[in-house]
């Protein structure tokens, strides 16, 4: 196998047994693909698909005026170029967006002509606002902050059948219902009531009998009965009544009379229940008609209107009950045929017939009026209004859209073959839904499971943006319609008609403040990736926390391979916010799909299919870990499979699919936990969530025990620098990498050079530090996709969230009580968990009513010492180390004129004006903060003079840009001249450049000429002359292009900044704060084992082993058994082996053993023990082997993939190879006494993370401060500089101790006794420590509240 640039420097030993059939797909695809579909940028007009912006425009245009004499048509759109690149947008606090220009055509028709002849056509491009662009990492920059749009999991449009689970009625009877959910438009519900009549609701309003809707659709009673029921036909003869017999319909009934065959033999005796055997006999006997007594017909319902044959008079209406009197009338009128509805109690209930009986309407108009009254109560109905309203509800494409998904789901559910159709409902659709509902009530068919992932779909960014865009367009449409009537008379152009504000506002609102547009979690690369792969059931059109029950939150069988069963937040959102599984993707309808290998007759193929939850149900799916022989055949007699969402076992030949990988069940974060299979699910959940809170450490350290997913996460997260094209490293320094691209990868017209500017010490959304470090050296060869620089929390292109620590599981003096953690001082000395946090502090100079604020170093009443870190512009130097209270930016604000005393006037006259009329409002370092200034940015509005600092910053930026462009030109020029040299050497020259005719050119001649002179050469070969001319033109073009680029950047830098109204200047100061680990910080492993650092001990006091190596960290063994996360113990053992092997390699290097020995030992490590994949060490040269061995000194990194990791025997073998005890335990000695502990202790290496819950951010103290307005009690919380609440239980505690005075002090002068506390403050200042308690303010509030209840309470003094 081929290793990438970073892989061969440090190969990870892989313990997996199963082959990788499919690589983990690109992890951000769900975001990028969705938004690409939405924009369709760069797609030619004829290839535009009907999605995204294009679909939104097509659905709203053409807009036709009310008179019909003018129309505005949509022709196409184009996206402009962004004004600033991503970094500039973040810096300036603007949105990364492109202008959208739409070409529209205004057509004016001739009023006079009959056939609408076109009078005038105008085409024009109209600006429709800005559309935010997605960065290449799947985020949006909105107002300078990086945001993520989270995908939403919502109920798919379509039709759903459900029941109330017996909760509505006291009898526990199941009431069935059907609901048609469109993508947009009114919901239509059908439901049964406890009396078994069917009702309809529109948009969850009051219910009407369902027959009202059918009548409004134009069905008569007879047609309705015809649709829903079969009929029994009775013939009236001289002898009485005879029934046209359909034997199947008698099944289950009790015979009211003897049923005989033609010969008179009794088949069913009276009073017996008719069974399937009886029906067979009846069918054999071939009885077509059956004489029945009169009582058999009594109580049945007529299916047709019964008319007097001679007079035409109606004897019985359709759907009326046949009574004794009616039958007499029928007999008298000599009616020969009666049709009744066939109903029974088993599978054909009289529900629709009963509903028709309670329906008061009789015709279509009455039904329409009834619906109008329900939808618009209180408005007088007219025929037209009622018809229009009803048609707009479900039959108008403008108001109602099922969408392609909805139609597909609808048709599939009601059993139609085709999956395409209209977006609006038809009469047949509504009737089919009712039929299905009645069938389900009759016991034929089952209800849907709304938590099945076949009934829930994912709405991604693109789709949500399209919906918002459409909302904006619809608002525009209303305005345009009104203006169109003026267009014909006033000769307006399209841009006069369209006001783009509503569109821009809708888009801005969605990206800026939608519930699903979230501030990106940027703690570390994993938290970024997880945030982009999150799927939320909350948000507009989704669920709310309060209403979501247990079922929605629960793990469903269809989650397998689509949504992670582990990773979800703890707390109120549990189960509502999920993470995509590692291999999941969405299909064209938005349903989640998972990949499977195809299995044919027990033979597993390499063909991979992606199936949604619906498609997968009928398949028999084997686990990825099913045993196969070497030809890929299933060999077990019974294979564990999933079928119909159940786990079961089947024979190999029944299996149709097989999982792709064991990790396809879990999400990215969960797949980073080694030995996940040995952890309890609750702890695994905490482990996945806490990895996202790990703060990037100063020096990232790869995990010794990983899972092999680390590289994928680091690469896909976008924090590393990945080579766009292969080539040779031309130059590299800390802030940029220049690559000379391989010739075969350079396309014509492109420069053969790639320049990568690295991000240095930048602030992330969570105030952590983003910094990139180059991994390559000058002259290295890199291929496309290689990692050239590490970002935060990555080490050689692998995710590295924490540090490998030597741990011992043992109690230690009670310092590790309740999950506390005991650390060694060495960890602090080596800066293992030191993190850098960057804070942005902003100083804004505004234009006030009294005059402009000024940023200056001339601040009144401030000593020289306070100003020694500021430059002449009043702004702090970069590199200054500042403490709390230091001035960062000097600023003065004019203050209002006050009446001056004569003395002040005199002083002013003597010492001049300035000092008094301004006050100091400088930006100072906040309390509890100390750090180093690492960057300053100055933004000045247009028209305001820029200060010296702003100009200096601008000069520096221009130098950087110029340096990049020069470098690019140097390499392009070099490559061009190399090509020319190859062509010219050996050719004959005709003269020019001071050479004689007939000179043969060699390297010496060319080296003697200046490069500009080369183009003056006249060659004998015309082709060479042409090549020289082309090269000269090409270089001139390149130079011009780069100069234009420079001028463009310069223009951008020199133009004023777009600041908020009233703001003259903004100065941003960035402070880097170094935080060492200290007691009170929260740490965790990857298995949900979290704790707080309780004590940092001197190295000499820590337990040490027989070699004298002390442990770094002591954990409590009691934290393991009850929590059932045994994975951490296995990780510790394997970590010990990894470290031991590293030490062994280190000894070999120090003893300067031969490379062959090293190679052999590495072969043992990588290829002898466990794992299927053999590492191809022979492909590495000796120098590469030495390089690899040197990188392995700290430990051989291992990968134990989830559900396919190292076995116990393999861990033991690894320990043995490292010459360590196979038990993983060793005797330790007490550092303080030197005595041996009485039992062996588990010691090893565990990967520990420092979480973003730092004691520095939480520690807080208050003496006096702000008070709440009403109660006069101190505010709460660090942000408000609040106090500690002395609550109910604390009061009880003091009462229990009888500490009356302390209690009084707590409730009065220390809280809300206003006079008492001011008096006490004065007393303390005077050195008098007495206190007098008065009346607490909250008591007055209480009295006021009692008075508001109408009870007058007064306090009277005795």
Curated annotation (Swiss-Prot):
<dbReference type="GO" id="GO:0003677">
    <property type="term" value="F:DNA binding"/>
</dbReference>
<dbReference type="GO" id="GO:0000428">
    <property type="term" value="C:DNA-directed RNA polymerase complex"/>
</dbReference>
<dbReference type="GO" id="GO:0003899">
    <property type="term" value="F:DNA-directed RNA polymerase activity"/>
</dbReference>
<dbReference type="Pfam" id="PF04563">
    <property type="entry name" value="RNA_pol_Rpb2_1"/>
</dbReference>
<dbReference type="Pfam" id="PF10385">
    <property type="entry name" value="RNA_pol_Rpb2_45"/>
</dbReference>
<dbReference type="InterPro" id="IPR037034">
    <property type="entry name" value="RNA_pol_Rpb2_2_sf"/>
</dbReference>
<dbReference type="InterPro" id="IPR007645">
    <property type="entry name" value="RNA_pol_Rpb2_3"/>
</dbReference>
<dbReference type="Pfam" id="PF04565">
    <property type="entry name" value="RNA_pol_Rpb2_3"/>
</dbReference>
<dbReference type="InterPro" id="IPR007120">
    <property type="entry name" value="DNA-dir_RNAP_su2_dom"/>
</dbReference>
<protein>
    <recommendedName>
        <fullName>DNA-directed RNA polymerase subunit beta</fullName>
        <ecNumber>2.7.7.6</ecNumber>
    </recommendedName>
</protein>
<dbReference type="InterPro" id="IPR014724">
    <property type="entry name" value="RNA_pol_RPB2_OB-fold"/>
</dbReference>
<dbReference type="InterPro" id="IPR042107">
    <property type="entry name" value="DNA-dir_RNA_pol_bsu_ext_1_sf"/>
</dbReference>
<dbReference type="InterPro" id="IPR007642">
    <property type="entry name" value="RNA_pol_Rpb2_2"/>
</dbReference>
<dbReference type="Pfam" id="PF04560">
    <property type="entry name" value="RNA_pol_Rpb2_7"/>
</dbReference>
<dbReference type="InterPro" id="IPR007641">
    <property type="entry name" value="RNA_pol_Rpb2_7"/>
</dbReference>
<dbReference type="InterPro" id="IPR010243">
    <property type="entry name" value="RNA_pol_bsu_bac"/>
</dbReference>
<keyword id="KW-0804">Transcription</keyword>
<dbReference type="InterPro" id="IPR007121">
    <property type="entry name" value="RNA_pol_bsu_CS"/>
</dbReference>
<keyword id="KW-0808">Transferase</keyword>
<dbReference type="GO" id="GO:0006351">
    <property type="term" value="P:DNA-templated transcription"/>
</dbReference>
<dbReference type="Pfam" id="PF00562">
    <property type="entry name" value="RNA_pol_Rpb2_6"/>
</dbReference>
<dbReference type="Pfam" id="PF04561">
    <property type="entry name" value="RNA_pol_Rpb2_2"/>
</dbReference>
<dbReference type="InterPro" id="IPR019462">
    <property type="entry name" value="DNA-dir_RNA_pol_bsu_external_1"/>
</dbReference>
<dbReference type="InterPro" id="IPR037033">
    <property type="entry name" value="DNA-dir_RNAP_su2_hyb_sf"/>
</dbReference>
<keyword id="KW-0548">Nucleotidyltransferase</keyword>
<dbReference type="InterPro" id="IPR015712">
    <property type="entry name" value="DNA-dir_RNA_pol_su2"/>
</dbReference>
<comment type="similarity">
    <text>Belongs to the RNA polymerase beta chain family.</text>
</comment>
<keyword id="KW-0240">DNA-directed RNA polymerase</keyword>
<comment type="function">
    <text>DNA-dependent RNA polymerase catalyzes the transcription of DNA into RNA using the four ribonucleoside triphosphates as substrates.</text>
</comment>
<comment type="subunit">
    <text>The RNAP catalytic core consists of 2 alpha, 1 beta, 1 beta' and 1 omega subunit. When a sigma factor is associated with the core the holoenzyme is formed, which can initiate transcription.</text>
</comment>
<dbReference type="InterPro" id="IPR007644">
    <property type="entry name" value="RNA_pol_bsu_protrusion"/>
</dbReference>
<dbReference type="GO" id="GO:0032549">
    <property type="term" value="F:ribonucleoside binding"/>
</dbReference>
